[in-house]
């Protein structure tokens, strides 16, 4: 379940275990939802540049995934990610359209998803950015997508962001034939993801904040 996208489709009363997916799945799903709804995704690849995690070794040692056995704090490590498959459970129309991989890097927090997508409708940088800007400002994804215009944006800047996806609008690329787009989405893989888990937990527990204005 990615809160903001498919949480309303679950039966809270009849479900015993809820999965809030992963930090990467929560980061890419809102943006992919916007692109799929507005431009149509034909196929694509997702590469996540991810802060190292406690699944890796601090010193070279044994690991069931050999590369993850190498020292996390001094190496860039190519590894797998389940986000490419998980996102198709959140957005079923993307099934069999995406591949995904990861590079773990020696930063303690702050990650980046790079999405290279072929779309069915010809587009432009302005159109892509406008679609995501609108979704970040109105609708069901205002707590999920942060539309960022900072030209100096780097990974440290997004730490502590409450949105699960920080869209880097200045990095958007569209190919000359207008059918291939590259999107850069930052995310705080700790705090930003935790906020999504809390949103889902509140929904399941039927905790509501009443706002009067």
Spans of model-derived segments:
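N-terminal Rossmann-like NAD(P) cofactor-binding subdomain of oxidoreductases
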Residues: 1-69, 175-177, 199-200, 208-211
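A generic structural signal for alpha-helix starts
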Residues: 26, 122-123, 191-192
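Structured loop/turn residues at secondary-structure junctions
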Residues: 23, 79, 120, 188-189
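Generic recognition of short, well-ordered alpha-helical segments
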Residues: 30, 127, 195-196
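C-terminal substrate-binding/catalytic lobe of Rossmann-fold NAD(P)-dependent oxidoreductases
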Residues: 40-181
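NAD(P)-dependent Rossmann-like dehydrogenase/reductase catalytic/cofactor-binding core
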Residues: 159-213
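Generic alpha-helical structural context detector
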Residues: 33, 89, 133, 199-202
């Amino acid at each position: 379940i990615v809160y903001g996208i498919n949480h309303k489709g679950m039966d809270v009363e009849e479900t015993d275990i809820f999965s809030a997916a992963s930090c990467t799945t929560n980061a890419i799903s809102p943006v992919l939802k916007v692109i799929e709804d507005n431009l149509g995704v034909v196929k694509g690849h997702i590469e996540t540049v991810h802060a190292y995690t406690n699944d890796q070794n601090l010193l070279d040692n044994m690991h069931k995934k050999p590369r993850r056995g190498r020292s996390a704090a001094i190496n860039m490590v190519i590894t797998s990610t389940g986000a490419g498959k998980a996102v198709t459970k959140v957005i079923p129309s993307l099934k069999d359209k995406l591949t995904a991989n990861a590079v773990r890097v020696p930063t303690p927090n702050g990650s980046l998803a790079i999405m290279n997508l072929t779309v069915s409708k010809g587009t432009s940088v302005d159109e892509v950015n406008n679609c995501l800007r609108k979704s970040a400002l109105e609708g069901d994804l205002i707590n999920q997508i942060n539309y960022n215009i900072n030209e100096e944006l780097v990974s440290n800047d997004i730490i502590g962001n409450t949105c699960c996806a920080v869209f880097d609008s200045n990095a958007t690329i569209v190919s000359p034939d207008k059918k291939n787009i590259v999107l850069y989405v930052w995310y705080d893989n700790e705090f930003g993801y935790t906020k999504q888990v809390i949103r889902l937990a509140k929904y399941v527990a039927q905790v509501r904040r009443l706002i009067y204005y």
